[in-house]
Amino acid sequence: MFNFKCVFYFIPSTGHCVPPARSGHRCVADSNNLYVFGGYNPDFEEAGGSENEDYPLFRELWRFHFATATWQLVRTEGYMPTELASMSAVLHGNNLLVFGGTGIPFGENNGNDVHVCNVHYKRWNLLNCRGKKPNKIYGQAMVIINGYLYVFGGTTGYLYSTDLHRLDLTTREWTHLKPNNAPSDLPEERYRHELAHDGQRIYILGGGTSWTSYPLDKIHAYNLETNYWEDIVTKPHEKIGYPAARRCHSCVQVKDEVFICGGYNGEVILSDLWKINLQTFQWTKLPAVMPEPAYFHCATVTPAGCMYVHGGVVNMSGNRRTGSLYKVWLVVPSLLEMTWEKLLKTFPYLAQLSTLQLLNLGLTHTLIQRLK
């Protein structure tokens, strides 16, 4: 019997090869794998010592295979970007799109290119774009809606932005969108916020500057049809209220529900998990608590609705980072997912069998693909 609980599970790795502790990285997932790109760790030993040519950054792409719980450093071809902290990343089909980010020192070596890595063919390409590109920034957020990539906010390291740009992924042309609002009605400049969308509006969740974090009781929403920014008043969780203001948190979306987790409010590192429904704008605090509070971590969600959280800064005074990986189901898993988890737990050596053996056991081709 599967007893569903909204709780974080620590995922021990079965191999010797694991990514070092890091922050400022990004991750994406498909049904089979979690991909972790970039990151930063000023601790020389933790960051790989003299073997890491890019210290204190990580110029690398890691893959975590769900079925076997193993990490692998992905050997890629082509030019991998060097802006490795606080870039934005999104998975579009088999393509990992990476935009912006900063090198070291922060703010001195920023990017405004779109790099694409096909995770199937393991090859990086630079997307040759025209039009009005965003400034060289980091800490921005982005979403893909109907073949357009939208980028909002970010910082040069000195100035914070409230700019909204759109890239047509078919024509590869950038457009600097100019909303119809008066300048005083635009969202506050920010970085390390997150974005969600419902197809008609883009919602900004949190973020801030080096001296402030923005609250979540009201949310700025950009209306794609009217070209106006709107203010959305949200509803608090009964007797609990609203989530704390935060920046450097993570955010994933499952249909109409958006989940935020962790972050920093200017005083403490957060460990809570909240969801907001984009139809009712009702906030709900979920029972799951991160095993260690973290910010500058990364999170993503699988198509089946399981969120993975990796890394982050977990101690401010010691500036300590973690390399821990956790997962939490955000929805009740399907019967297939429950059975699959049980099968992998009971027969951990399933992946070592041949395709013919697996077919003889009754596994479908789709499930066999998840093992390879």
Give the role of each language-model region:
Residues E108, V114-L224:
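Solenoidal tandem-repeat scaffolds enriched in leucines and small polar residues
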Residues F2-T14, A69-R75, K122-C129, T171-A182, ...:
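Trp- and S/T/G-rich repeat-edge/linker motifs of beta-rich repeat architectures
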Residues S50-A69, G111-R123, T162-E173, L216-Y228, ...:
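Beta-propeller blade signature
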Residues F2-Y9, N41, T300-K372:
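Cullin-RING E3 adaptor/co-adaptor recruitment helices
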Residues M1-S13, F37-Q72, G107, H120:
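Beta-propeller domains
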Residues I11-G24, E53-D54, R75-L84, F106, ...:
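Short loop/turn motifs that recur once per blade in beta-propeller domains
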Residues H16, D30-D54, T76, H92-N110, ...:
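Glycine-centered tight turns/hairpins at beta-strand boundaries that repeat
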Residues S23-C27, E83-A89, D113, K136-M142, ...:
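Beta-propeller and closely related beta-sheet repeat lectin domains
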